[in-house]
Design a protein with these regions (language model features):
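Helix-to-loop junctions at the C-terminal end of transmembrane segments
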Residues: 48, 143-155, 242-243
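A membrane-interface helix-boundary motif in multi-pass transporters
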Residues: 45-61, 240-258
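Intrinsic disorder in cytosolic terminal tails and internal cytosolic loops
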Residues: 77-87, 268-324
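Intracellular juxtamembrane helix-capping segments at the cytosolic ends
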Residues: 4-17, 197-212
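C-terminal membrane-cytosol helix-exit motif in multi-pass small-molecule transporters
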Residues: 44-45, 59-79, 261-269
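Pair of pore-lining "gating" transmembrane helices in MFS-fold secondary transporters
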Residues: 90-111, 190, 194
Length: 324
């Protein structure tokens, strides 16, 4: 249901945006989406985590949010399915983007699926668990822009590797702190979130460096699917790890995922020359929970409706010196 809501909302935003306002619209969407995610985590602090109250509250809030749309006199947008690009094709275009987004989906799912369980297991109370889960989201809001600026100035693969290493170190240090060092634990979570969430946008931006505007939305569909596939695996893997290896394995697994992303980025740097800075597209922050439709809010992207014939020049491998 929520996936459908994201698609509808993003289609509406895309329909009402112009080329001059798409960047602003995506920025506002990013801030509202991440802000809502952070506030939602704080609801754990109410102490109602063992009842259905929070689920009921979420249902009520979603229902209330629909009311202004129903009362609006504005017509519904013309929904069209975007052209898709296969995962196999994406692996040929940008292996790092595909692998990075898949592992990133696993890590995010682990954090939000079992993070609260970890917090309670190390002795945090409900209020502290709320802060523990909110810190990564606000870390993402704080560090998203600086990370994006760095990726526009340097080889994006180097930035992906650096961000993954920093996130891995922060996650590793988090295992050393508990209730008695709660402030230090929050700092680690803030830094970890500031590296985890920007990786999503970094990988998409890296893939876009090899694509034309008409290919970006098609590629986003496949990349979102890869990230979603990783997210499906994350929570069960974290649960199995905690059950068989103990609660201490939670951040060990997350650190391992960050290390894999960094190692693969380093490997890819040895396999393909960097895209020159002047040929790179700008970094565009995209919410982790968005659908492929959000890619259309990127001012550089161009929509290709499903079924429309793709010209030869729209093939990522057509006259592209950076794909090999």
């Amino acid at each position: 249901c929520f996936a459908g809501m994201y698609i509808v909302c993003e289609s509406w935003l895309n329909d009402k945006s112009t080329n001059e306002t798409r960047g602003q619209m995506l920025s506002l969407y990013m801030i509202i989406s991440m802000g809502g995610l952070g506030i939602g985590q704080m609801m754990i602090s109410t102490g109602a985590e063992n009842s259905m109250a929070l689920f009921i509250l979420a249902s009520v809030l979603v229902s209330i949010a629909v009311v202004p749309v129903l009362l609006s006199a504005t017509g519904a947008p013309n929904f069209e399915e975007p052209e898709r690009m296969s995962v196999r094709r994406l692996l040929q275009v940008s292996p790092l983007a595909v692998i990075g987004l898949g592992l990133n989906g696993v890590a995010v799912s682990m954090l939000f699926g079992m993070g609260a369980v970890y917090g309670l297991s190390i002795g945090l109370d409900s209020s502290e668990v709320g802060y523990f889960m909110t810190a990564p989201v606000f870390g993402a809001l704080i560090l998203q822009y600086p990370v994006g600026r760095l990726s526009d100035r340097f080889d994006r693969r180097m930035v992906i590797m650096g961000v993954a290493v920093v996130g891995g170190i922060a996650a590793g240090l988090a295992t050393l702190f508990g209730k008695g060092e709660f402030a230090l634990l929050l700092v680690c979570m803030l830094i970890y979130g500031g590296s985890l969430f920007p990786l999503y946008s970094l990988c998409i931006a890296h893939a876009n460096d090899f694509l034309t505007p008409r290919q970006m939305v098609a590629a986003a569909s496949g990349l979102v699917m890869v990230n979603g596939g990783g997210a499906v695996l994350g929570s069960p893997l974290a649960a199995l790890s905690i059950e068989f290896l103990g609660i201490g394995s939670f951040f060990v697994m997350i650190t391992g995922l960050q290390a894999l992303i960094a190692a693969f980025a380093l490997y890819r740097m040895s396999q393909r020359a960097a895209v020159p800075n002047e040929a790179q597209g700008p970094f565009v922050a995209i919410p982790e929970s968005s659908s492929a439709i959000a890619a259309t809010l990127n001012p550089e992207a161009e929509w290709i409706p499903s079924g429309e014939e793709i010209a030869a020049e729209d093939d990522p491998f057509h006259d592209n010196p950076y794909v090999n």
